Amino acid sequence: AYQDVNFNDDGTKMYTISWYDDYIRQYTLSTGFDVSTASSSYSSLSIASQDGLTNGMTFTNNGTRLFVAGDSSNSIIEYTLSTAYDITTASHVGSTSVASQATAPESVAFNNAGTKMYVVEKSNHNVIEYDIATPFRLNSETGTVGTILRGTYGTLTLNSNGSYTYVADSSIVGLDANESVIDYFNYTVSDGTATDTAELK
């Protein structure tokens, strides 16, 4: 049985999630938001290794992160997508337990800024609100120098000399005049002897 349905920003991709087999399925729509034009074939992403009873799902505004409500694990499961809204490029980042507040989470949503997360708790029919320190980030990511780290609006590469390169996603080209967005990266680096922690934005 399908538990949730979602679309990309222009409605040309549709996603369903099923607790029966723990798969997210991605369909292409030739006409945006018209389900009668959905392709018969689909791409899929298995959530089974992270949770055995998945419910709701949501994407970040630019489609580079995916969050799934895991009923059996009482957690929110987080993925990064190297290509926006393409679940075949998804990588599991981690799972965040909400068991102490939300038993059997049924759905998950964020405010536009990604600084608040809302989880529908099935057992007692509550909506639980969480503050998020770094927008749309529930789990930290690790990597070596030169590794590309995905942000909300682009990617960051840290170099061995302490410099960095940031590449903005093409999606932000659509910003209106005088409109801006901010990406946040909290990082800790170590050379085996000393460590340093900082925030880039």
Predicted regions and their residues:
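Residue-level detector of Asp-centered blade-edge/turn motifs that repeat once per structural unit
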Residues: 7-10, 61-62, 110-113
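Short loop/turn segments immediately following the C-termini of beta-strands
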Residues: 19, 71, 122
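Short loop/turn segments immediately following beta-strands, especially the blade-tip
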Residues: 26-37, 79-88, 129-138
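Surface loop/turn motifs at the tips and blade-to-blade linkers of beta-strand repeat domains
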Residues: 45-50, 96-101
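Acidic, turn/loop-rich segments in luminal/extracellular domains of secretory-pathway
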Residues: 141-201
